[in-house]
Amino acid sequence: MQLQEIFQSYSTFGFSGSRFSSGVLPPNVLSSAAKSVPKGSRVVIGCQKGVDAFFRQCFPNAEVFSVASGKWGSGKGAYAARSIACIKAVADDSGLWISFPASECPPGLIPSNKSSQCFSGKGSGSWASLAFACGLGVSCLVYSPFGIPDSWNFSHLPDLNKWFSFYQRTSINQLSLF
């Protein structure tokens, strides 16, 4: 299965990832994800450098969740609050969360629908965001050179090297009453 096939099932996309992507995340991987977003889709992105900046360039009409707006307070906590709001925007639209962490998952971090358990100072906003998205039941795709902890219940995508998926099944196959 290719990215385009997966992305066609969604109309809202959230992108997240490392502030320092060079050397770990190949530019062609980021580009292929950007090119897979169907035209007219809603795209939500954070305000950081690195992966956020790349997708802001690709999608000039994206909704940018910016800490500088003051909407989420100030200091480090504002970045977590901003990320939580961004993830909830994707969750509310049954969208797809796409993550590009540039490090291994911090020990002890697991998916949870409680933001305080995900954003608990373990050291990686990318992984914290992914843990919260999964905890909320958001469908997720991850490009990770480091893999995903087994306890997260992600599947490796065999046709896509270093890509992993977690699908909320009802997002892909709508249940029918008739």
Regions found by a protein language model. Give the residues of each.
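SAM-dependent methyltransferases
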Residues: 161-178
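Acidic/glycine-enriched connector segments
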Residues: 2-12, 17-162
